Regions:
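Helix-to-loop junction immediately C-terminal to a conserved catalytic motif
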Residues: 55
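Conserved ABC ATPase "signature" region
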Residues: 71, 119-136
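A short, proline-enriched helix->beta-strand linker immediately N-terminal to the Walker B motif
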Residues: 160-164
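Catalytic Walker B motif of ABC-type/P-loop ATPase nucleotide-binding domains
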Residues: 166-169
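Conserved ABC transporter NBD signature motif
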Residues: 63-71
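Conserved ABC ATPase signature
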Residues: 141-145, 149
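The feature captures the beta-strand-to-loop junction immediately N-terminal to the Walker
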Residues: 40-42
């Protein structure tokens, strides 16, 4: 039986980088089922690269990642792809195919990874678009959509196969404050309503403080994780200067109580 709050993803001693250069090493954390988990850190700390490692687009140089208790870093490509079927991913900007309509973008994973007939796929596409608040615009091209609408289409596509974990890479980038807040509310509603676990790369303080209930903080200089916990707890209780500088960018952070890092 799967219990809410039990670990759905476990990361132990992870190291990764590019072209022989290590971005991060000895990174460990657990993601609880049903949580909204933040990957935090300044620019260049390896947040988006960590996401690529977690979803299997890049292999780590050391360490283990386990989904539901199954370690998948050392699996061959077909076996890792099977694990990946449990993941939905929204890359920066939505990453939509420019030559496809909104509906065609959402339909693509259903066409690729299921044997559903066309009417069933059409029904699911409409369901997913409605789920993210897009009752209209299914036949429009990405270039004709606003930034917020493109993100919603990308989110609908990420949800197409009913993932257990939803990965979001800087989902608020390029959105105005109102659109960003609406998107945050949508993500929280998906977690609350459907129990999906969310792992989100973000540097946006309103999103971090507003919807994330756990997280890990990566430091570019130390090249490892220097703090763990909910963003608002790190803001109020972590004394590490790098964490404090990140969390207190602007008045939204509020006063720190500085009681140490978890």
């Amino acid at each position: 039986m799967r219990h809410p709050g039990s670990p759905i993803l476990e990361v132990l001693g992870l190291a990764y980088g590019y072209n022989g250069e290590t971005l991060q090493h000895d990174v460990s954390f657990d993601v609880k089922r049903g949580s909204i988990f933040a990957i935090m850190g300044a620019s260049g700390s390896g947040k988006s690269t960590l996401l690529k490692v977690l979803i299997g687009l890049q292999r780590p140089s050391a360490g283990e990642i386990a989904f539901g208790g199954v370690s998948y870093c050392s699996l061959d490509d077909p076996e890792r792809a099977e694990i990946g079927r449990h993941f939905g991913v929204l890359f920066q900007g939505g990453a939509l195919w420019s030559s496809m309509t909104a509906a065609e973008n959402v339909a693509l994973p259903l066409q690729m990874f299921t044997e559903l007939d066309r009417p069933s796929i059409e029904a699911l596409v409409q369901l997913k678009l409605t789920l993210v608040g897009l009752d209209t615009g299914r036949d429009r091209m990405p270039s004709d959509l606003s930034g917020g609408m493109r993100q919603r289409v990308g989110l609908a596509r990420a949800l197409a196969l009913d993932p257990e974990i939803l990965f979001l890479d800087e989902p608020s980038t390029g959105l105005d404050p109102i659109s960003a807040r609406h998107f945050d509310d949508l993500v929280k509603g998906l977690r609350d309503g459907f129990g999906v676990t969310v792992i989100m790369v973000s540097h946006e303080l309103p999103s971090l403080f507003g919807i994330c209930d756990d997280g890990v903080f990566l430091d570019a200089e130390a090249r490892t994780a220097i703090a763990h916990g909910a963003p608002h707890i790190l803001r109020d209780e972590c004394t590490h200067p790098t964490v404090q500088a990140f969390m207190h960018r602007g008045s939204i952070a509020g006063p720190s109580q500085s009681r140490g890092c978890s």
